Amino acid sequence: MLKEITETIKRLSGSILLLLLSFAIRRRKEYVAIGSWGGENYIDNGRYLAEYICKNRKDLKVFWVGTKKTRDEVEKKLSPYRFLEKDTVSANIALLKCRYMFFSQMHNYDISSYNVYRKAT
């Protein structure tokens, strides 16, 4: 019970901090974040969208959001890749800069458990 309360307080504090940071960090229209299958797999429509953008839209920077499990595969297939490990502090700050976010399941499952979506499309 105490562990659950601690986790809830931690998650709420993180969300509030990210919300406050979102007012100071400007979204960049050339940044695109893509996630799929909770970050566990580099598959599905998100994969093809990411590869298409990297190949055909050199003006955009693609960030793939995933777990450590998918990092190696993303490095091999997505060039130039920018991998963000889901729910890490550095990933959430980088996500605050992304103007566009694409996901296959739900935003809080594929991209981040924290609220990094204010003013994102």
Task: Please annotate each region the language model reported.
Residues 1-38:
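Membrane-proximal basic amphipathic "stem/tether" segments
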Residues 30-121:
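Active-site and donor-binding regions of nucleotide-sugar-utilizing enzymes
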